[in-house]
Amino acid sequence: MIQAHRFKAHKALNFDSWAEARTHGVTATEVANASTPAGFRNLVDSYGNPPEPYDNPYMAFGRKTEGPVSEWLKERFGIFPNEWLISHDNPIYMATPDGLSLDHTVISEIKTTGKDFGDKIPIGYRRQVQWQLYVTGAAYCVFTWMLRVETRTGEFQPGWIEPKTIKVLPSRDTIEGLIDVANRLWDIKQELLGKNGEK
């Protein structure tokens, strides 16, 4: 079980607190995005020049779909929706998986896509999930995706009756590489936090 002190902030209960807590560590999204040289540079640039918040129909469809898919995962696998930012024993390693079983041994991650992933999920998502597995200590992740199709009126709707899933196990080699990325990111974050504190 994940100890209570590792549940840092709840996204739905207090978004600002959740967002603030994320700045004091390195998240799964950050590690996944920074795992290539170009991605690392882009993410570091964004620390100094945060992009303006934006939204689009693809993101809106993803938010709309996540609720029903979360309920399906709860009924099918006993994985409950999660909004908690969770830390590793090392508190700078953080993640907010989309779902968490009651015994904390299984997590889920939900995506929507315009193209079926088939039997191999995209590398960026695999890295994100591996980091979530490392942070939570879960035995595996039920990676879940729903196809997005466009209607004649230009609206998006689910393309399947039920989502598809793949069971993802931890990969020690992948995780070790992600730890290195996270440590390098954290060094830079600390530098920036220190500079901001001096102002």
Residue ranges of model-derived segments:
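Charged, glycine-rich intrinsically disordered N-terminal tails and low-complexity linkers that flank
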Residues: 1-64, 68, 76
